[in-house]
Amino acid sequence: MAYSYTEKKRIRKDFSKLPDVMDVPYLLAIQLDSYREFLQAGATKDQFRDVGLHAAFKSVFPIISYSGNAALEYVGYRLGEPAFDVKECVLRGVTYAVPLRVKVRLIIFDKESSNKAIKDIKEQEVYMGEIPLMTENGTFVINGTERVIVSQLHRSPGVFFDHDRGKTHSSGKLLYSARIIPYRGSWLDFEFDPKDCVFVRIDRRRKLPASVLLRALGYTTEEVLDAFYTTNVFHVKGESLSLELVPQRLRGEIAVLDIQDDKGKVIVEQGRRITARHINQLEKAGIKELDVPLDYVLGRTTAKAIVHPATGEILAECNTELNTEILAKIAKAQVVRIETLYTNDIDCGPFVSDTLKIDSTSNQLEALVEIYRMMRPGEPPTKDAAETLFNNLFFSPERYDLSAVGRMKFNRRIGRTEIEGSGVLCKEDIVAVLKTLVDIRNGKGIVDDIDHLGNRRVRCVGEMAENQFRVGLVRVERAVKERLSMAESEGLMPQDLINAKPVAAAVKEFFGSSQLSQFMDQNNPLSEITHKRRVSALGPGGLTRERAGFEVRDVHPTHYGRVCPIETPEGPNIGLINSLAAYARTNQYGFLESPYRVVKDALVTDEIVFLSAIEEADHVIAQASATMNDKGQLVDELVAVRHLNEFTVKAPEDVTLMDVSPKQVVSVAASLIPFLEHDDANRALMGSNMQRQAVPTLRADKPLVGTGMERNVARDSGVCVVARRGGVIDSVDASRIVVRVADDEVETGEAGVDIYNLTKYTRSNQNTCINQRPLVSKGDRVQRSDIMADGPSTDMGELALGQNMRIAFMAWNGFNFEDSICLSERVVQEDRFTTIHIQELTCVARDTKLGPEEITADIPNVGEAALNKLDEAGIVYVGAEVGAGDILVGKVTPKGETQLTPEEKLLRAIFGEKASDVKDTSLRVPTGTKGTVIDVQVFTRDGVERDARALSIEKSQLDEIRKDLNEEFRIVEGATFERLRSALVGHKAEGGAGLKKGQEITDEVLDGLEHGQWFKLRMAEDALNEQLEKAQAYIVDRRRLLDDKFEDKKRKLQQGDDLAPGVLKIVKVYLAIRRRIQPGDKMAGRHGNKGVVSVIMPVEDMPHDANGTPVDVVLNPLGVPSRMNVGQILETHLGLAAKGLGEKINRMVEEQRKVAELRTFLDEIYNQIGGRNEDLDSFSDQEILDLANNLRGGVPMATPVFDGAKESEIKAMLKLADLPESGQMQLTDGRTGNKFERPVTVGYMYMLKLNHLVDDKMHARSTGSYSLVTQQPLGGKAQFGGQRFGEMEVWALEAYGAAYTLQEMLTVKSDDVNGRTKMYKNIVDGDHRMEPGMPESFNVLIKEIRSLGIDIDLETE
């Protein structure tokens, strides 16, 4: 097996037993693929597929004017280039987007000609606003902040059948309903009422009998009955009737007279119920007709109108119940044939017939009018209006679209074979739905499960953007239609017709403020990846929190391998926001698919198929862990399988598919929890969620016990620098890596240099620090997609969210009561959990009515000391240490004349003093913050003079760019001259560059010449001369290219910034704040074991083992049994073994043992104890030494979920590390020196520091701001608010009779305005008395009573 650059340096011991059939797919594919599909950026006109933007344009265009004399057609579109790259957009606070230019064609027809001859054609490109681009990591930069569009899980379009679970009617009768849900357009519902009539609702309005809809579609009563019922035919024979017999229809009826066969043998006696046995006998006897008395048809319903044979008079309409009166008429008129509907109470109810009876309409027009009245109550209906409204509802492609998915689901559900068809409904569709609904009511067929993932589909970014875009285009269409009529007469161009504002606004609104466009969770790489893989049932067109019941939130059998059953938030959103499973993807219709291996005749193949929830239902699917022999055959007599959404066992021959991996059930976050299979589900949920809140520590530390997914997450998250192409590292420093690309990967005519600029100390969305550190050294060889630099929370290309801590499970002095955590001071000293947080503070200078604000160091009434960290422009120096209240940017604002006191006016009059015209509005460091200034950015409006600071920042940025380009040129030049050297050496020169004719060119000769002189050489061979000329042209060309590139970037830097109206200048100051761990911070393991640091003890007081090694963390053992997350104990044991092995290797390295010994010991670790074998023989001795060096801190282990280390393997590892197999040790109390009475579990657990830091939460108020109306103090830390003294707290003081405390709580400390100002003055004067007055809330109450029209006054004595 081939190891990558970083894998070679540190191999993770893998305990997995099952083979890797399929790698985990690229984790951000769901976002990137969807948006790529939407934009189709590289496609030419002919390559456009009918999706995304192209589909949106095609659905709205061509736009035809009202008169039909002009049309605007869509030809194609192209995307421009972004003005700034991603980093610049974040810095400048702008959107990373490209201009969209659409080519449209205006066609004007000749009014006079009969066949609409074309009079004029104009084509033009029209600008249609900006389309945000997705960055390569699946995010969008909108107004300078990174956002993620979360995918939405919504109900698939199509038809669904359901019942009300007996909740509507008191009898508990099941009322069935059908609903046709389009992708866009009106919903159509059919439902039964308790009397078994069928009703229809359009868009959940008032219900009408379903037959009204059928009549509106043009069906007559007879046609409706014909479609839904079969008929019984009776021939009239004098006083009796002869029934054309279909024996099956008699089942369950009571014979009204003896039924005999031809020979007179009685088959059924009179009064007996006819059973299946009787029917068989009747069929055998071959009886075709049955004589019945005339009253046999009483109460039956006519299927066709009964007509007088002579006069043509209608004796009974169709769908009429036959009674004695009608029968008498029939007998009198000598009618020969009667047709009645065949219905029974078992499987053929009279529902449609009954519905027709309650229907008041009798023809199509009346039905249309009835529907018009229901949709538009109060408007007078006309025939045209009624027809238009009805046609627009379901039959017009502009108003109604089932979409390809909807049509496919619709046809499948009603039992058709073809899956493609029109996007609008037709008559047959509606009848088919009604038939299916009636069948279900008759007991044939079952209702749908709406929580089945075959009935819910995922809407990704691309699709939602397309919908928004279409909304914008439809708005444009209305305006264009009106202007098109002018275009005919006035000769306008397409540009003049189209106003792109509505499109731009719709797109901007979607990306900026849609519920699904979320501020990216950027705590650490895992939280980024999880956020992009999130699937939400909320959002526009989805559910709302309040209305979502238990069923929607619950885990469904179809979630298996598609949606993670573990990772979902706790709280009101539980089950509504889910995470994609590790291997899941969406298919072309948007349904989630999971991969499976194909199994043929109990033989497992390596062929992989992706199936959606519907497709997999009929398969018999074995678990990934099913036992196989060497040939890949299933060997167990019975295999545990999933079939029809149930878990069961089957014989191996019946198995058709098998899971690809045990971790395909869970999401990325859950698959990072080692020994997940030993944790309770609730705790696993917390563990998954808390990993996303881990703050990146100062020095990342890989987990000793991982799952092997760490590398995938780090690689796919995009926080690491990954080699785009293989090559050799040319130079590397802290901020950039330069790679000379390998010759076989260089494309012709390009430089063959890859420069990677690393991100240094940048702020993330959550104010944590993003910093990249190079892993490679000069001269190293790297392959494509090797990791060259670590990002935040990554260590050698593996995700590293926390730190490995030596922990002991023991109760100790009550310091770990109720999940508290006791830490050793060493953890603080070694900066194990020190994190860096970066805050961005912004100062904006605006143009006010009284004049412009000014950024300056000349601030009134501020001492020298406060200004010593500012430069002459009034902006703080980079590197300055600042604390709360320090000035970062000096700014003064013009002050209005009105605020002058008489004394000031006098002074102004005497001295003509102008200094007090301005007030100090400087940017200061907020309370409770202290840190170091690490960066300053100045943005200046066009036309405003730039200050010295802005110019110096610009100069340093230009130097950086110049350095990059020079580096690139240097390598290009070097490579070119190397190639020339190898071509020229050993050949003869003709002269030039001071050489004699026929002189042989050697390395010495070339070294003696300057590079410029090489091109003056004339060689004997023409081919070499040509090569020299080409090389010279190439180098000149590259130089020019790079100079152009530099000029372009320089222009961008020097142009003014596009600031909001009224803003002259923006200064952004970035502060780096260092936070050590302290009591009150929240920490957690990966198993949902969270707690708050209660105390930090000196190292010497901590419990230590026989060697004197103190533990770092003491955890409470009582936190384990009741919570059932035993995974943490196993992790602790295996962590101890990992550390022990590392120490053993460390001793071997320090004793400078032979490489062969190291090799043997490493082989013992990796290849002798369970799990996957590693190919150590392919390593050179130097690589073995490098590996051993990196393992000295501990041998990292991987125990994948559901396929991890067994207890016996953990014991074997402990034994190999010369540690007790119990994992327990005798500890000594550091305070007393006494041994503890029993052995204690000690080991290494991976601990995370969560982003719930006490510094951000601790808060106290002295005086501060007050609410305007009630005059009470505000609440919350952000407003510098106070603590609420609520109703119950007042009761407490009342109960204790603490009258004075209560009085000041309700008056001077709250809303007695005069009392509190007076008290403040008194305290300043050293007088501690108070005089409570009238609370402001009393005045508010009086005003509220007056607002109700009641005059109320307070009578004062």
From Swiss-Prot:
Pfam families attached to this UniProt entry: RNA_pol_Rpb2_1, RNA_pol_Rpb2_2, RNA_pol_Rpb2_3, RNA_pol_Rpb2_45, RNA_pol_Rpb2_6, RNA_pol_Rpb2_7
EC numbers, comma separated: 2.7.7.6
Principal EC category: transferase
CDD domains: RNA_pol_B_RPB2
Keyword Nucleotidyltransferase: yes
Keywords: DNA-directed RNA polymerase, Nucleotidyltransferase, Transcription, Transferase
GO BP, sorted A to Z: DNA-templated transcription
Molecular function GO labels: DNA binding; DNA-directed RNA polymerase activity; ribonucleoside binding
Superkingdom to which the source organism belongs: Bacteria
Gene Ontology cellular-component terms listed: DNA-directed RNA polymerase complex
Similarity annotation: Belongs to the RNA polymerase beta chain family.
Protein known as: DNA-directed RNA polymerase subunit beta
Naturally occurring in which organism (per UniProt): Pseudomonas fluorescens (strain ATCC BAA-477 / NRRL B-23932 / Pf-5)
Gene that this polypeptide is encoded by: rpoB
